[in-house]
Amino acid sequence: MSSQQWLGDGTARRWRELHGESDWDGLLDPFDLDLRRTVIRYGEMAQATYDAFNHEKLSPHAGLSRFAARRFFERAQLPGHSAAYRVARFVYATSCVAVPEPLILRSASRARRCRESNWIGYVAVATDEGKAALGRRDIVVAWRGTVQSLEWIKDMDFVMVPPKGLLRDKASDAMVHRGWLSMYTSRDSESSHNKDSARDQVLSEVAKLVSMYQDEELSITVTGHSLGAALATLNAFDIVENGYNRAPRAAAAAAGCPVTAFVFASPRVGGHGFKRRFDGARGLGLRLLRVRNARDVVPRYPPAPPYHGVGTELAIDTGESPYLRRPGNELVWHNLECYLHGVAGARGGEAGRFKLAVERDVALANKSYGALRDEHAVPAGWWIPSNRGMVRGADGRWTLMDREEDEDSAE
């Protein structure tokens, strides 16, 4: 599949509009077709972090990516992305404060590679082919969330702290969730993966790519789901607040390239002071589109007040889909593939009814759970590694081999 076929006709010409230059005014209702495709495209880049994540606790590679950076999108079965983007770096996170177990997966193997760190996402950049199709050189940061039980969001404490290091001045009253900030900024000098924080890993790679392509038209796009959406919100703000969207040779007063976050099922990130500071960064090129499923509980946490949402909301309701079981359950309502199914069909028919306006295989909704009606004859949770990573050797013995050897080549 070529990049142009995958994107649709309007993306290159309208990319600034689709990335929120006018805050998506007039594009959400009725739901613009090119915007649907754009939201789905970045959602698939977030979904790839789930599809690649090794959550087999018995594996020494639990918590890492099963896919190598060089073949990442190909292995994630995203041929359009494979032509349009290359992964420049994998990103790892840890936390210096206690967080619920689903947020940091710990291997039970004595030979485990990661003890207190997990692979949390990647930085990618448009290829030359992708640049031609997209209309600019796009830098993407994709953050992984959690696919475990949703009890973690209810079990967390909701303490807010100042976002130290993220703000240029110390007088701000901005406050953010302690757990999200810790995942974003924590480092561990004893770790093989987190001597630098997730924040430092991402910002150094973004700075490198902005410098490398500073003579071209650039955009920075950040995406994530659930926990990944919270990290994406902090990251997008951080990039703009601290000028990482500006080329090194740019004049002091020069505008940086646009930074847009497309986030899904996002918990709230901070209080009113953070919202005010986030809104104030619009003038520096920051935009955020927050996709929320009507029945999903995660966007309702942490409670408001004192927490406040940021950005522009895109509301969907997967309960209106004729393809999905009714009423469903919390896991299905929160599932990213079901979100993308909802984006493909929300308000796509007459009188705002659900109808797939984008041809997207409904089988994807059953990738992790049994969301589809039985009449579609798609097994529940069908996305699993072949033989769960077990490989038969020449000696007839079966061995767990669930990691491509050049995984760390993008670090």
From Swiss-Prot:
Domain of life: Eukaryota
Signal peptide positions (record): none
EC top class, as a word: hydrolase
GO molecular function: phospholipase A1 activity
Cellular component, GO, one term: cytoplasm
Keywords: Cytoplasm, Hydrolase, Lipid degradation, Lipid metabolism
CDD domains tied to this protein: Lipase_3 (cd00519)
Gene Ontology biological process terms from the UniProt entry: lipid catabolic process
Active site: S226 (acyl-ester intermediate), S226 (charge relay system), D296 (charge relay system), H334 (charge relay system)
Location in the cell: Cytoplasm
Keyword Cytoplasm on entry: yes
EC numbers, comma separated: 3.1.1.-
InterPro entries: AB_hydrolase_fold, Fungal_lipase-type, PLA
Job description of the protein: Acylhydrolase that catalyzes the hydrolysis of phospholipids at the sn-1 position.
PANTHER family: PHOSPHOLIPASE A1-II 6, PHOSPHOLIPASE A1-IIGAMMA
UniProt record similarity statement: Belongs to the AB hydrolase superfamily. Lipase family.
Name assigned to this protein: Phospholipase A1-II 6
Taxonomy of the source species: Eukaryota, Viridiplantae, Streptophyta, Embryophyta, Tracheophyta
